[in-house]
Curated annotation (Swiss-Prot):
Residues 104-163 are annotated as: Interaction with the F-box domain of F-box proteins. The gene is Skp1. Undergoes autophagy-mediated degradation in the liver in a time-dependent manner. GO terms for molecular function: beta-catenin binding; cullin family protein binding; F-box domain binding; molecular function activator activity; protein domain specific binding; ubiquitin ligase complex scaffold activity; ubiquitin-like ligase-substrate adaptor activity. InterPro entries: SKP1, SKP1-like, SKP1-like_dim_sf, SKP1/BTB/POZ_sf, Skp1_comp_dimer, Skp1_comp_POZ. Essential component of the SCF (SKP1-CUL1-F-box protein) ubiquitin ligase complex, which mediates the ubiquitination of proteins involved in cell cycle progression, signal transduction and transcription. In the SCF complex, serves as an adapter that links the F-box protein to CUL1. The functional specificity of the SCF complex depends on the F-box protein as substrate recognition component. SCF(BTRC) and SCF(FBXW11) direct ubiquitination of CTNNB1 and participate in Wnt signaling. SCF(FBXW11) directs ubiquitination of phosphorylated NFKBIA. This is S-phase kinase-associated protein 1. The keyword Ubl conjugation applies. SUPFAM superfamilies: POZ domain, Skp1 dimerisation domain-like. There is a cross-link at residue 142 (Glycyl lysine isopeptide (Lys-Gly) (interchain with G-Cter in SUMO1)). It comes from Rattus norvegicus (Rat). Keywords: Isopeptide bond, Phosphoprotein, Ubl conjugation, Ubl conjugation pathway. Disulfide bonds: none annotated. SMART domains: Skp1 (SM00512). GO terms for biological process: chromatin remodeling; maintenance of protein location in nucleus; proteasome-mediated ubiquitin-dependent protein catabolic process; protein K48-linked ubiquitination; protein monoubiquitination; protein polyubiquitination; protein ubiquitination; SCF-dependent proteasomal ubiquitin-dependent protein catabolic process.
């Protein structure tokens, strides 16, 4: 199987099967635009927005999911679920918050829908059922509202909390 070289933002080069790399719509489009469709090339494809540690994780995820069917198109009317993350992905995403957020940014930049979906669902699950104070604590967010501002926001959004 032909391979391609991917270069991370910090200069590390990864040799990857072309079919695995093409799970990224961004890389697939680059290869098509450069006329490097399947024959491979010695010049690495630069990925200036992804460092080596994160690119290594992305390649690991893509390798595991190489035989998956393409993810379905989003249906605007369909309710989004966050309880359908495969066990392998749950284990794979047991990383620190910084790494998780870097994976979201990389999946978005590289346009890998399946990875973007599971990383965002993981963050959604970290938020689900928590109070604003618990969410702030989880994500180390400083509350910069004055007491008056907070009271005003609570008043305006009171309907949200009614059960």
């Amino acid at each position: 199987m032909p391979t391609i070289k991917l270069q991370s933002s910090d200069g590390e080069i990864f040799e990857v099967d072309v079919e695995i790399a093409k799970q990224s719509v961004t890389i697939k489009t680059m290869l098509e635009d450069l006329g490097m469709d399947d024959e491979g090339d010695d010049d690495p494809v630069p990925l200036p927005n992804v460092n080596a540690a994160i690119l290594k994780k992305v390649i690991q995820w893509c390798t595991h999911h190489k035989d998956d069917p393409p993810p379905p198109e989003d249906d605007e009317n369909k309710e989004k679920r966050t309880d359908d993350i495969p066990v392998w992905d749950q284990e794979f995403l047991k990383v620190d918050q910084g790494t998780l957020f870097e994976l979201i940014l990389a999946a978005n930049y590289l346009d890998i829908k399946g990875l973007l979906d599971v990383t965002c669902k993981t963050v959604a699950n970290m938020i689900k059922g928590k109070t604003p104070e618990e969410i702030r604590k989880t994500f180390n967010i400083k509350n910069d509202f004055t007491e008056e501002e907070e009271a005003q926001v609570r008043k305006e959004n009171q309907w949200c909390e009614e059960k």
